[in-house]
Curated annotation (Swiss-Prot):
Xref: HAMAP family: Ribosomal_uS4_B
Name of the protein described by the UniProt record: Small ribosomal subunit protein uS4
GO MF, one example: structural constituent of ribosome
Purpose: One of the primary rRNA binding proteins, it binds directly to 16S rRNA where it nucleates assembly of the body of the 30S subunit. With S5 and S12 plays an important role in translational accuracy.
GO terms (BP aspect): ribosomal small subunit biogenesis; translation
Keywords: Ribonucleoprotein, Ribosomal protein, RNA-binding, rRNA-binding
Stored SUPFAM superfamilies: Alpha-L RNA-binding motif (SSF55174)
Family annotation (InterPro entries): Ribosomal_uS4 (IPR022801), Ribosomal_uS4_bac-type (IPR005709), Ribosomal_uS4_CS (IPR018079), Ribosomal_uS4_N (IPR001912), S4_RNA-bd (IPR002942), S4_RNA-bd_sf (IPR036986)
Pfam family, one: S4
Similarity field: Belongs to the universal ribosomal protein uS4 family.
CDD domains the UniProt entry points to: S4
């Protein structure tokens, strides 16, 4: 399995992102040295794509496949792309507060901690649908790891499109998110322009 191993703060600095979007409380003490440099139109489009890939932990080939799928769906391609990325199971676990970061959520899914509608899911790219019930397996709920995670991440604000029961470590997808409910600082229209060339 290919994983991006670039240091988080270094990558956040280069993309102009706040580490809090990824679930990190760290802050960079360095100044942006290239902040005043003029960026071309292609450079802006590429940066937006890299931001989205980095935030959601998706590599180039799956990201391109998500774009193709979003392009074939009805509606706006950019909005469809963001909805697909938000509905990945690793992102949903992060949003529900069952993981501190998306990387940790991915690992929790990989290690078979998660069930969707009563069935174990161990594929981080699994896409949830409206009405799906996501739960941490009974055998994993009382582990020290899950207790530590819930203690730290449990206070996170859950988006409107999700419903969570923190006691049972269970969440429900009420509906797929709209663009207003997605708080990721990405301009998806620039990504659409990049791929439509």
């Amino acid at each position: 399995m290919a994983v991006n191993k670039v240091p988080v703060l270094k990558r956040c600095r280069s993309l102009g992102l706040e580490p809090s979007y990824l679930g990190y409380d760290k802050k960079s003490r360095r100044n942006l040295t290239r902040a005043n440099r003029k960026v071309s139109e292609y450079g802006l489009q590429l940066r937006e794509k890299q931001k989205a890939k980095f935030i959601y932990g998706v590599l180039e080939k799956p990201f391109r496949n998500y774009y193709k799928k979003a392009d074939q769906m009805k509606g706006l391609t950019g909005l469809n792309l963001m909805t697909i990325l938000e509905s990945r199971i690793d992102n949903v676990i992060f949003r529900l507060g069952f993981a501190r970061t998306r990387k940790e959520a991915r690992q929790i899914v990989d290690h078979k901690f998660v069930t969707v509608n009563g069935k174990v899911v161990n594929i981080p790219s699994y896409l949830v649908k409206a009405g799906d019930v996501i739960e941490i397996k009974e055998s994993k709920k009382n582990t020290q790891r899950m207790k530590d995670i819930v203690e730290v991440a449990g206070g996170r604000i859950v988006p409107e499109w999700l419903d969570v029961d923190a006691e049972k470590l269970q969440g429900t997808v009420k509906d797929l998110p709209t663009r207003e409910q997605i708080d990721v600082p990405v301009d998806e229209m620039l990504i659409v322009e990049l791929y439509s060339k």
